[in-house]
From Swiss-Prot:
Gene3D superfamilies the UniProt entry points to: 1.10.132.30, 1.10.150.390, 1.10.1790.20, 1.10.40.90, 2.40.40.20, 2.40.50.100, RNA polymerase II, clamp domain, RNA polymerase Rpb1, domain 3
Catalytic activity entry: RNA(n) + a ribonucleoside 5'-triphosphate = RNA(n+1) + diphosphate
Organism of provenance: Shewanella loihica (strain ATCC BAA-1088 / PV-4)
Listed GO MF terms: DNA binding; DNA-directed RNA polymerase activity; magnesium ion binding; zinc ion binding
Protein's name according to its UniProt entry: DNA-directed RNA polymerase subunit beta'
GO biological processes: DNA-templated transcription
Keywords: DNA-directed RNA polymerase, Magnesium, Metal-binding, Nucleotidyltransferase, Transcription, Transferase, Zinc
GO cellular component: DNA-directed RNA polymerase complex
Binding site for Zn(2+) 1: C70, C72, C85, C88
Cofactor field: Mg(2+); Zn(2+)
Domain of life: Bacteria
Residues binding Mg(2+), per UniProt: D460, D462, D464
SMART domains recorded: RPOLA_N (SM00663)
PANTHER family: DNA-DIRECTED RNA POLYMERASE, DNA-DIRECTED RNA POLYMERASE SUBUNIT BETA
Length: 1404
């Protein structure tokens, strides 16, 4: 018996390996793998079902069909192990070897491997420097190629058609050699001397001027170097020997009725063998050339189909007209080996069932049906039954369990105790989609789920199903309990807020409990303690909502954990006093002494977690839930039709709107307004009518008038059920109530345009047929959108996970001083995100000082928690430089200090945390909530955009940011710079609002003036763009010739005449080269200079400019010299929602991006060409001027002679991330992407921490382009990982050599995933063929650094609990082999394990 065990053990040991290398297999290597040549296309004998000899399933080559039994039956049983039968030639061994042993086919003629031929760029083509078309013509026998030119005028690699070849033969005889087919290509490849080629090309590179040629040579050089360094030989891209897959991996299964189900590969192999055998025979017979050629071509095609069916020509189809699945199809795509079998596997010890509510469970429990538990824990039960002596053998135990003897249930109870199970609901969008619970046995067949974890699972009880998994080993149970238990996952990893907040019924119950009612029964009573309140409530003396006075006891916990009690009397209600009973000690009573809506409850739980920690919060959350359910039941809140009160004013409001619409209609018919204006106005009228109706309705619903104790009328918040549900945040919203009791309002057509006749009815009144029909559009669109959205969002998540999967925290501090400067986010007049929310949980990068002093408030490397943020707010700090993963210096990972707080745990992140995957999940999970559509800005919205003044919302002082300005004759400031901003600062120096002010805005207030809320501080004309004079003087026209460069126009109404500059296209030839301008001269007739510069005050006028001054007129500073009419900006569709997020992460270029200045300098315009303007920037330091052609229709923001800074906007438009990175640097591009992504999510009310987006951006920025190679081995223009360049540069600097210079590159997430160092990870993501081809040619080796690679090879991942295992392995690898581990006998191991299990199961 012992021998048997020993024998079984030794087969499963795999050798340790550091990485996986992929390369090309030489013919000799293929032969060395093989156990014999497959010569016949036969598979198995259909009568005996025995494999045919030398066929595709031959037992002699691949091994026996039955365990330890040769084919003819001469040798059976274990004792003949390893004998080779002399009759049938089969080795007696396990049948498992049929999964491992390969065969081979010797090809009669070499065949090109289709991956290296057709996978773009064609590797064979690059190697030979020939085009793919030419090579294909050679391979498929359409033309000859010269192999040895000899002494002739032909060139090596030259193509010859059949005729040319015959001519050449006549001319030169056998001086030269030309061939066709794969043999020819093979000889060409064999003749390449890699070393010589590399030397020649490296010498040639510096002298090449043409960009395309340099690119081509660099590509070829890279390929040849890859071959040279990896030891691959180019001729191995042509196959001489074809390996045959082991037969059990391409099985043939007999079905009943004498038919067979077979893997497609068998068909493909059969074709290859048939053609190969036929070709051999033809060659032996010395058949005519044309027949042999045809057969060779067919062989090439059948091998192509076997390797990658459908890559060339039409795919070979089987009997049922579908393409056969080739070897390449086996590994790629969702059903391929990578994604189906290696990255996701099915597991045993799992069950699934429908879920129902378990309102009586505790947070760490779930209800598990008895039947399910019995099945899942069977092995444990057998073991326990045997151990207790209730069953003698496993078989007996099995019988007992099948009969469900009473003892079995006792044993099951025992087994289940403290044994967590994992519950999972598909789709698992983030890590909270699998959590561990302790099972509680229940009758019935449905799993019971705790209501508070529904939010994390996104589960509801309308038929959702969930799966149960049992962690078997001790380690797995330990991990499930300590990391995955629902009680340990209270905070969301996406934003650090509680994810187990009550919703729906619970919220309604708590809200109802905490409301107050005027003149309730028992109002005005005073109680000595909360217990007394409860007594009064239970006996019916005081009702739940009565306003009373109560003396309460509060506990405060100091920093050192010391508790102090204090008593005070508070004005409160009976309900709130009852709520305070479940409030944990240490929280202030004020937290429940208010109307408890959903937001308040969430804040309450958050406060509880931060102040009292995990355990108290869990208990408190459960208590809140029980209380909420109880009082929601007591309240009797329900939805009745009478609760939907329709306001009386509705009908008059609708009538008024109809009258207004009629008026507009009349104006339109008499031609006063255009069709477009009429449409927009009608929509505006109805939109505002709808607003008024819904306001009237909400006012009506939300208050009621009651008689108070003094007999007077008083209004209070209403107890209307529907209003309470909406107000508490339990269910429904004002918009939904509006449709029930107000009016449904305007509807959209399927194309997104708004129908101008609104639905004036509501659901209580009911809709007529037309109204109902209009409504169906929206409902259908919603359903279609949802389906699309789910797929798109899932794909985005997959790309994000793939790009970030290998990012892990690997050290505590990288020591960098870099970071991002955080300020509060302000848009227009609102603080969208205060500073505290942006820096909470981050680490300070540079000391923060007390304002105006040199004293340090928060030293560098402080982790900013809630207390620190309060301090920053106290001292009104409004910018902090914090560490960020984008600027982290760690190679192949990030450090804990740059990441900051682990949001799901609330402390500094641990080493080994897989932050990349968490970030991807946090961004991808809310993806399904984002909208899919692009917004058409039409009707009401488009006119709002043309504001003509800036009105402030808060009092404060005015501050200008990068604004140049002049003072006009009225003493007001006029802005004469482009990207100026005006901000309002409060008395503490905090910024409250910020507005962009364009060129030509007139400021009503000077800088540092104080303003009151509601004041207008700036005015401008939104429809024209002025040119403002910066000096006072008299006007001189330059190149202004009537009829040539300008025309005079007189306004009919006012009689004023103005000069209009003509567009270049409209001018006669004489005016084409002229450049009309206005020059300002002083009283002495000399040119005036722009103040502070040597530039003459000369303003060039673009086409269509309107000049209202005459020649020689006097002008003051700040006056408008000319106006350029702005055509109302085209209403651009705003891409919103999911597509916008995807565009940002894919770093796609917008259609018409903003044009940014490439250098700092002075603007001038050069010679114009057809349709384009030439913009010239002359650098201030006198460098070479930079020119750029810009289409004429782009609205430029700059004038001649103006100074611009590098990266400033020259022409408006959406900014391209690549430009921002190039011109403004890495921090600006990070800021831009973070803000843009956050805008989309914020619109949907989804909170995601900036950190997660930064993690993805770090991965998008991980490549760089080498600009100067220095003394490194990189090539200029090569794309390399930044970490690798940094490491190489450190070594070079240490040796005193020249380091390489590089520029960071921004890659979209798909590009970045495919460009990762690990080819296994890239291949399992997308474009498997291309990735593997590239890796094989380069002989790449995968160091298995990331998570995916390790999952695929079946190891622990280098993150989380597997992190320690990997660190110790890496250290062991560096320190050399470890000493032998002392062996341990089976009995000892069993004893140790029993002790361990005993420990775990003991009540202590």
């Amino acid at each position: 018996m012992k021998d048997l065990l020993k024998f079984l053990k030794q087969q499963s040991k795999t050798e340790e390996f550091e990485g996986i290398k992929i390369g090309l297999a030489s013919p000799d290597l293929i032969r060395s793998w093989s156990f014999g040549e497959v010569k016949k296309p036969e598979t198995i004998n259909y009568r005996t079902f025995k494999p045919e000899r030398e066929g595709l399933f031959c037992a002699r080559i691949f091994g026996p069909v039955k365990d330890y039994e040769c084919l003819c039956g001469k040798y059976k049983r274990l004792k003949h192990r390893g004998v080779i039968c002399e009759k049938c030639g089969v080795e007696v061994t396990q049948t498992k070897v049929r999964r491992e042993r390969m065969g081979h086919i010797d090809l009669a003629s070499p065949v090109a491997h289709i991956w290296f031929l057709k996978s773009l760029p064609s590797r064979i083509g690059l190697m030979l420097d020939m085009t793919l078309r030419d090579i294909e013509r050679v391979l498929y026998f359409e033309s000859f190629v010269v192999i040895e030119p000899g002494m002739t005028s032909l060139e090596r690699g030259q193509m010859l058609t059949e005729e040319n070849y015959l001519d050449a033969l006549e001319e030169y005889g056998d001086e030269f050699e030309a061939k066709m087919g794969a043999e020819a290509v093979l000889e060409l490849l064999r003749a390449i001397d890699l070393e010589k080629e590399i030397e020649e090309m490296r010498e040639e590179l510096p002298s090449i001027n043409s960009e395309t040629r340099r690119k081509k040579i660099t590509k070829r050089l890279k390929l040849i170097e890859a071959f040279y360094q990896s030891g691959n030989k180019p001729e191995w891209m042509i196959l001489k020997v074809l390996p045959v897959l082991p037969p059990d991996l391409r099985p043939l299964v007999p079905l009943d009725g004498g038919r067979f189900a077979t893997s497609d590969l068998n068909d493909l192999y059969r074709r290859v063998i048939n053609r190969n055998n036929r070709l051999k025979r033809l060659l032996d017979l010395a058949a005519p050339d044309i027949i042999v050629r045809n057969e060779k071509r067919m062989l090439q095609e059948s091998v192509d189909a076997l390797l990658d069916n459908g890559r060339r020509g039409r795919a070979i189809t089987g009997s049922n007209k579908r393409p056969l699945k080739s070897l390449a199809d086996m590994i790629k795509g969702k059903q391929g080996r990578f994604r189906q079998n290696l990255l996701g596997k099915r597991v045993d010890y799992s069950g699934r069932s429908v879920i129902t509510v378990g309102p009586t469970l505790r947070l760490h429990q779930c209800g598990l049906p008895k039947k399910m538990a019995l099945e899942l824990f069977k092995p444990f039960i057998y073991g326990k039954l045997e151990g207790r002596g209730l069953a003698t053998t496993i078989k007996a135990a099995k019988k007992m369990v099948e009969r469900e003897v009473p003892e079995v249930w006792d044993v099951l109870d025992d087994v289940i105790r403290e044994h967590p199970v994992m519950l999972n609901r598909a789709p698992t969008l983030h890590r909270l989609g699998i959590q561990a619970f302790e099972p509680v046995l229940i009758e019935g067949k449905a799993i019971q789920l705790h209501p508070l974890v529904c939010a994390a699972y996104n589960a509801d009880f309308d038929g959702d199903q969930m799966a149960v998994h049992v962690p078997l080993t001790l380690e797995a149970q330990l991990e499930a309990r300590s990391l995955m238990m629902s009680t340990n996952n209270i905070l969301s990893p996406a934003n650090g807020e509680p994810v187990i907040t009550p919703s729906q019924d619970v919220v309604l119950g708590l809200y109802y409990t905490s409301r107050e009612r005027i003149n309730g029964r028992g109002e005005g009573m005073a109680f000595e303690s909360v217990a007394e309140v409860e007594k009064a409530y239970r006996t019916g003396v005081a009702e739940l909502h009565a306003r009373v006075k109560v003396r309460i006891t509060e506990t405060t916990i100091a920093e050192d954990g010391e508790r102090t009690e204090s008593r005070r009397i508070v004005d409160t209600t009976v309900g709130r006093a009852l709520l305070s009973q479940v409030l944990p000690k240490g929280l202030s009573y004020d937290l429940v002494n208010q109307n408890m809506g959903k937001k308040q409850i969430s804040k309450l739980l958050n406060t509880c977690y931060r102040q009292l920690g995990l355990k108290d919060t869990v208990i408190f959350a459960d208590q809140l839930m029980y209380t909420g359910f109880h009082f929601a039941t007591v309240s009797g809140a329900s939805v009745g039709i009478n609760d939907m009160v329709i306001p009386d004013e509705k009908y008059s409001l609708v009538a008024d709107a109809e009258a207004e619409v009629l008026e507009i209609q009349e104006q339109f018919q008499s031609g006063l307004v255009t069709a477009g204006e009429r449409y927009n106005k009608v929509i505006d009228i109805w939109a505002s009518a709808n607003e008024k109706v819904s306001k009237a309705m909400m006012d009506n619903l939300s208050t009621e008038t009651v008689i108070n104790r003094d007999g007077e009328e008083e209004t209070q918040a209403s107890f209307n059920s529907i209003y309470m549900m909406a107000d508490s945040g339990a269910r429904g919203s004002a918009a939904q109530i509006r449709q029930l009791a107000g009016m449904r309002g305007l509807m959209a057509k399927p194309d997104g345009s708004i129908i101008e006749t609104p639905i004036t009815a509501n659901f209580r009144e009911g809709l007529n047929v037309l109204q109902y029909f209009i409504s169906t559009h929206g409902a259908r669109k919603g359903l279609a959108d949802t389906a699309l959205k789910t797929a798109n969002s899932g794909y985005l998540t997959r790309r994000l996970v793939d790009v970030a999967q290998d990012l892990v925290v690997i050290e505590d501090d990288c020591g960098t001083h870099e970071g991002l400067t955080m300020k509060p986010l302000i848009e227009g007049g609102d603080v969208v995100e205060p500073l505290r929310e942006r820096v909470l949980g981050r680490v300070v990068a540079e000391d923060v000082y007390y304002p105006g002093t040199e004293d340090v408030l928060a030293p560098r490397n402080t982790l900013l928690d809630e207390a620190w943020c309060d301090k920053l707010e106290e001292h009104s700090i409004d910018e902090v430089k914090v560490r960020s993963v984008i600027s982290c210096d760690t190679d192949f990972g990030v450090c804990a200090a740059c990441y900051g707080r682990d949001l799901a745990r609330g402390h500094l992140i641990n080493q080994g945390e897989a932050i990349g995957v968490v970030a991807a999940q946090s961004i991808g999970e809310p993806g399904t909530q984002l909208t899919m559509r692009t917004f058409h800005i039409g009707g009401a919205a488009s006119r709002a955009s043309a504001e003509n003044n800036v009105q402030v919302k808060n009092a404060g002082t005015v501050k200008l940011h990068n604004a140049k300005h002049v003072t006009n004759s009225d003493g007001k400031l006029v802005i004469v710079s482009r990207s100026s901003e005006i901000a309002i600062i409060d008395e503490l120096g905090r910024e409250k609002e910020r507005y962009k002010v364009p060129y030509g805005t007139v400021l009503e207030k000077l800088e540092d003036a104080t303003v009151n809320a509601g004041e207008v501080i700036a005015n401008r004309d939104p429809h024209t763009h002025p040119i403002v004079s910066e000096v006072a003087g008299s006007i001189k026209f330059v190149d202004m010739i009537e009829g040539v460069t300008m025309t005079r126009q007189t306004d009919e109404l006012t009689g004023l005449s103005s000069i209009v500059v003509m567009d270049v296209g409209q001018r006669p030839t004489a005016g084409k080269e002229m450049r009309p301008a206005i020059r300002l001269v002083g009283a002495d007739g000399n040119d005036l200079m722009i103040p502070g510069t040597e530039v003459p005050a000369q303003y060039f006028l673009p086409g269509k400019a309107i000049v209202n001054q005459d020649d020689n007129a006097q002008i003051a500073v700040g006056d408008a010299l000319a106006r350029i009419p702005q055509e109302s900006s085209k209403t651009r569709d705003i891409t919103g929602g999911l597509p916008r997020v995807a565009d940002l992460f894919e770093a796609r270029k917008p259609k018409e991006p903003a044009i940014l200045a490439e250098y700092s300098g002075t603007i001038s315009f050069g010679k114009e060409t057809k349709g384009k303007r030439r913009l010239v920037i002359t650098p201030a330091d006198g460098g070479k001027p930079y020119e750029e052609m810009i289409p004429k229709w782009r609205n430029l923001n700059v004038f001649e002679g103006e100074k611009v800074e590098r990266g400033e906007v020259i022409a408006d438009g959406p900014e391209a991330a690549h430009d921002i990175l190039r011109l403004r640097g890495i921090h600006k591009v990070a800021n831009y992407i973070v803000n843009e992504v956050q805008d989309v999510y914020r619109l949907q009310g989804v909170k995601i921490n900036d950190k997660h987006i930064e993690v993805i951006i770090r991965q998008m920025l991980r490549k760089c382009e080498i600009t100067e190679a220095g003394d490194s081995e990189f090539l200029p223009g090569e794309q390399v990982e930044v970490s690798r360049v940094k490491i190489a540069n450190r070594e070079l600097e240490a040796q005193g050599k020249e380091p390489a210079k590089f520029e960071r590159e921004l890659l979209g997430i798909t590009k970045a995933s495919l460009a990762t160092e690990s080819f296994i990870s890239a291949a399992s993501f997308q474009e498997t063929t291309r990735v593997l081809t590239e890796a094989a040619v380069g002989g790449k080796s995968d160091k298995l650094r990331g998570l995916k690679e390790n999952v695929i090879v079946g190891r622990l991942i280098p993150a989380g609990t597997g992190y320690a295992y990997h660190t110790s392995r890496n250290q062991a690898a560096q320190n050399g082999p470890a000493e032998e581990v002392p062996a341990i006998s089976a009995s000892e191991a069993e004893q140790n394990l029993a002790d361990l299990l005993n420990l775990a199961g003991s009540p202590e």
